[in-house]
Each structure stands twice: as C-alpha cells, then as structure tokens.
Amino acid sequence: MDYRNILLIKMSSLGDILHTLPLAAALRQRYPKAKITWLVHPQFAGFVPDPPVIDEVLYFD
C-alpha cells in the first residue's frame, strides 16, 4: 500500500518524542514518496528531524 500523507502525533514528553525518531526514519525509508508531517509542542520542535526525514512540522500549543 502506498501512503501519500503520514501524520505523526507526539506533541510533548521528550522521552516519547525520542523513542519515535527511529519510527520516523523507518517510515521515510518504507514510504519515500509520502509527505510526513509531525505534530509537536513548540518547545520540542528542535528534536524533530529535518528534511528529508520529516517534510513538515505543525505546532500545537
């Protein structure tokens, strides 16, 4: 199955965000053409991988 859009929702809790990093890389490898977006609290945005792993970061306050 080819996915065009994937949304990761890990808004806060640093440990949860760090544990999701390998998943983000695996999703990029498995679905190279998908747009991957991560929803996160602004204070944790620095931990979200840059492109090409994550295409867009959305902030939830």
Where are the language model's segments positioned?
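Catalytic machinery of carbohydrate-active enzymes
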Residues: 1-61
